[in-house]
A protein has these predicted regions:
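N-terminal first-folded block
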Residues: 7-11, 17-42
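Residue-level detector of conserved, well-ordered beta-strand and adjacent loop positions
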Residues: 9, 42, 53, 84, ...
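Vicinal oxygen chelate
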Residues: 63-105
């Protein structure tokens, strides 16, 4: 069901300062940027991203890539998982928030709409 860890999301109060830290100090590469609210950074040789967001998060968030959010939800509910947030549209597909039987919260998402499109400066374009 899980294909991979798509991303780990961290809250940062200032995206530009966080990008200086993670890019210049830690050497992560910018994959995409959505204005002053979000940016995705490549983690090493993997295609898992560290996503920095200015929106408040209760805790760091782990997002798992699945083939289909709806199919994954059906399976998760059958085996004791809980639906916390109904599926909703995101730029690349669908997303939902779920919880395992031990109250570990995580996100599942699919790429039913494809990858983000970016310009030469890695800014997300529509």
């Amino acid at each position: 069901m899980f294909q991979k860890i798509d991303c780990i999301r961290f809250h940062v109060p200032d995206l530009d300062k966080a990008l200086i830290f993670y890019r210049e100090k830690l050497g992560l590469k910018l994959v995409w940027r959505l204005g002053n609210s979000e940016a995705g950074l490549k983690i090493g040789d993997s295609d898992t991203e560290l996503v920095l967001v200015t929106e408040e998060l209760e805790q760091p968030e782990i997002d798992f890539m699945v083939d289909s959010v709806h199919s994954a939800l059906e399976k998760l509910k059958k085996i004791g998982g809980k639906l916390l947030v109904e599926p909703f549209e995101i730029k690349i597909g669908k997303c939902s928030v779920v919880e395992d039987p031990w109250n570990n919260r995580f996100v599942i998402l699919d790429r039913s709409k494809g990858l983000l499109k970016v310009d030469e400066n890695k800014n997300v374009i529509q």
